[in-house]
């Protein structure tokens, strides 16, 4: 079974403030149980409870997906499934959350799982370290009852399969379009896929969706900023036919955009 459900980690403890005179440096009282107090102050207990009960699927843990997953967990979502087969490469370090010199060669899903458990020790986390394509897509989508899905896949065919599978199951989904070859963060937009424009990946995806009768029905995070000339090169890598130049902050911004759609959707604030 490729779906290796992670065991739930122990709860954080409390450290009492150290006694002593006022002039002494005193230890701050730490209470890890209330780490979501600022979120509750913003959203209220009822909506925070909705997030705690929600299960979000994130597929693709590169420059966009890992940021999306972390922001969603930091907002208080209590269950998550993350999926990616890639290991960290040196070329990932300029933009990917899990990529450090010390993590090169390690599985992205495993590294991210450690971060997510450290943020919320009580999270129910499922880690899938396989490429999601063909029949794997249906297996993944049917493995649990999800409340929202994030598509952060950068290859067209598995991206299309995940989107179609989610739509067939009436699973709310947000999809990231191309974050490469762009530098202006103010150009990012969130819209129904039918409203996307001046994004080559979105254009190709729409054409493929039209062939299967899909023209709308999910939000996309994209940027109409023209791609910088010379930022695309062809390559011969597994599951990849090209490499695109990227800057550190645009993929992160796209991931945050995806997270915002998920969080607002789960609490009923997404128009």
What annotation goes with each model-predicted range?
Residues 74-79:
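Conserved S-adenosyl-L-methionine
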Residues 64:
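Hydrophobic/small residue at the entry helix of a nucleotide-binding pocket
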Residues 129-136:
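Conserved SAM/SAH-binding loop
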Residues 29-31, 144-147, 153-158, 168, ...:
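Glycine-rich phosphate/adenylate-binding loop
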Residues 24, 28-56:
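N-terminal charged helix/coil linker that caps or initiates catalytic domains
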Residues 84-119:
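Glycine-rich phosphate-binding loop and adjoining beta1-alpha1-beta2 segment
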Residues 136-145:
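Short amphipathic alpha-helix with an adjacent loop that forms part of the alpha/beta core around
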Residues 59-60, 83:
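Conserved N-terminal Rossmann-fold NAD(P)-binding element of oxidoreductases
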